[in-house]
Curated annotation (Swiss-Prot):
Protein name as catalogued: Endonuclease 8
A GO BP entry: base-excision repair
Cofactor(s) demanded: Zn(2+)
Enzymatic reactions: 2'-deoxyribonucleotide-(2'-deoxyribose 5'-phosphate)-2'-deoxyribonucleotide-DNA = a 3'-end 2'-deoxyribonucleotide-(2,3-dehydro-2,3-deoxyribose 5'-phosphate)-DNA + a 5'-end 5'-phospho-2'-deoxyribonucleoside-DNA + H(+)
Pfam families (UniProt xref): Fapy_DNA_glyco (PF01149), H2TH (PF06831), zf-FPG_IleRS (PF06827)
Originating species: Salmonella heidelberg (strain SL476)
Residue numbers annotated as active site: 2-3, 53, 253
Keyword vocabulary terms for this entry: DNA damage, DNA repair, DNA-binding, Glycosidase, Hydrolase, Lyase, Metal-binding, Multifunctional enzyme, Zinc, Zinc-finger
Residues annotated for DNA binding in this entry: 70, 125, 169
Length: 263
């Protein structure tokens, strides 16, 4: 499943295609959304927000389309009039004069009013988004030490969207390697230096992944661009200590780590 950085990049692509342009045609597959087709035609997409792995498409009339891709959903951008060759099932089409965005295969799709946004079960449940620039390491540290989370092992906590939205398995693996900890630790057992390092890594690594993953490191500046240090690198040497990276299972997900320098 895509994690927060991938979801945010997808939202950026969708925004670049249709934000601020009048919608010339709107189509929904689900019967309960059909009444909104005429209400949205002629309106503008004002912004596309991410809340962890959910997308919120905000319209100029105050409505918001909530969608969660789950395992199989995918958004695509096409030129208006193009007919994509795909076996996927179309769920949403938002069309402008020159670009159209399409949502395939997703089933978790709703239209929300401004009031419903504040009471939606998933949105109420998720924690602050790691890609929200307003979120600070100090706030993350306070969250780590809160009664709700301080006794949770990191193996499960870093996959829990109620703790921080947008984290997932590869981020869990890379964050714990960065701070030299195993997944069995709990926040209540860390010293001040470890807490500070983890609080920063929980924001720095997702944000680095969002801004640079997939780019070529032309200047060869070590650490300037995101790349996997341990994820999917079992059997290779750890670049920090030379130990051999191992693969195991934690919280029912593949976990990669260096037993030599992660304690």
């Amino acid at each position: 499943m895509p994690e927060g950085p991938e979801i945010r990049r997808a939202a950026d692509n969708l925004e670049a295609a249709i934000k601020g342009k009048p919608l010339t045609d709107v189509w929904f597959a689900f019967a309960q959304l059909k009444p909104y087709e005429s209400q949205l035609t002629g309106q503008l997409v004002t912004r596309i927000e991410t809340r962890g792995k959910a997308l919120l498409t905000h319209f100029s009339n105050g409505l918001t389309l909530y969608s969660h891709n789950q395992l199989y959903g995918v958004w695509r951008v096409i030129d208006t009039g193009e007919i994509p060759q795909t076996t996927r099932i179309l769920r949403v089409r938002l069309q402008t004069a020159d670009k159209t965005i399409l949502l395939y295969s997703a089933s978790d799709i709703e239209m929300l009013t401004a009031e419903q946004l504040t009471t939606h079960p998933f949105l109420q449940r998720v924690g602050p988004d790691v890609l929200d620039a307003r979120l600070t390491p100090e706030e993350v540290k306070a969250r780590l030490l809160s009664p709700r989370f301080r006794n949770r092992q990191f193996s499960g906590l870093l996959l829990d969207q109620a703790f921080l939205a947008g984290l997932g398995n590869y981020l869990r693996v890379e964050i714990l390697w960065q701070v030299g900890l195993t997944g069995q630790h709990k926040a209540k057992d860390l010293n001040e230096a470890q807490l500070n390092a983890l609080s920063h890594a929980l924001l720095d690594i997702p944000r680095l992944s969002y801004t640079t993953r997939g780019q070529a490191d032309e200047n060869k500046h070590h650490g300037a661009l995101f790349r996997f240090k341990v994820f999917h690198r079992d059997g290779e040497a750890c670049e920090r200590c030379g130990g051999i990276i191992e693969k195991t299972t934690l919280s029912s997900r593949p976990f990669y780590w260096c037993p030599h320098c992660q304690k």
